[in-house]
Amino acid sequence: QDRAGQAALSRIAQQLQAQGMALKARCHGPSGAWRVEVTVVDGLKASKVVRGPLADGHEVDMGTPAGVPLAAASVDAGGFSPDVQFNRQWLRTLMAQHRFSNLPDAWWHFAQQGSGPVSVAAR
């Protein structure tokens, strides 16, 4: 886990807090990728940003649980409600604004762009 990634995640958490949500991010395995999930803290504020059931203390509805490697969690998985599709796209966009790419295996799996030994050494 590099400092740039942690700093970016901290900025994302601050942005989400202002929108009535909280970020949970854990380094996921030796690849340095991140498992990301978003929890609703204030449903009224969150309703201006995301869709679906927004009960305080519950995760934003992404169609499958975070951290569970299911075929339905893949980025290309179909058959979800418009709310779930919207929320997944919203999360991809939010993370991309902070230089994280969504890995194709799961909506909750992200890697920081330009991370790795070469980029870290170049800084």
Map each language-model feature to its residues:
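Cell-envelope/glycan interface and biosynthesis
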Residues: Q1-A122
